[in-house]
Amino acid sequence: VAASYSTGHCALLEHPEHQEASATSSSWLAHDLEAWVCQPSRWSSQAALSGGDDCRLKLWDRRSAGACSRSLRHDAGVTMIVEHPTVPYLFLSGSYDESVRVWDTRALGRPVHSLSVGGGVWRLKWSACCQRLLCAAMYNGFKVLAFSSATGLQLLEEFNSPHSSIAYGADWVGSFSESDRQLVATCSFYDHLLCLWSHSF
């Protein structure tokens, strides 16, 4: 488990079996401003990724806390990082600069794909089929994106009303009896609203 803090620090936590509380295994100053996201890599036990309000996405070597192996600049704070569920070398970042970027760890000079969603990217969530993404785009509602290595990112569907506040959270909630439909839950901030809607695959 990983945690990010408003101080700019990130921490990796362990929860040993038969113990009630988690213990911090390592902690380090990752960003000059608030750290918005931190996660250990699902593909490498020695890697972690973080993003902060200093406009940086950073890759870390967990064998040496505080050793940044790569720092990738964005145009605004980095708020979200998700690895591809089945392709070990791909991950996505979301930012206040309103773009979703796809990165390839084998060539990190620039993103391999990018898509503007018209609002700060606060949440990204893969579908079970690994070809669709939910995106909470803050002041521009919720999106369903498609991704393939060949065509990149594409906007498939948008959902806004009755949300009237910041698009904050989104998740897939299982499926309907029809195999081509998927239930989606979205929530917005100041209006305290949770909505359920369906997406057709």
Residue ranges of each PLM-predicted region?
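Hydrophobic beta-strand positions that form the internal "hydrophobic ladder"
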Residues: V1, A48, F91, L133-L134, ...
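WD40/WD-repeat beta-propeller blade N-cap
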Residues: W28-A35, S71-V78, L115-V121, F159-A167
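Loop/turn segments within WD40 beta-propeller blades
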Residues: C38-Q46, V82-Y89, K125-Q131, D171-R181
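Blade-level signature of beta-propeller repeat domains, shared across WD40, Kelch, NHL, RCC1
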Residues: G169, V173-F201
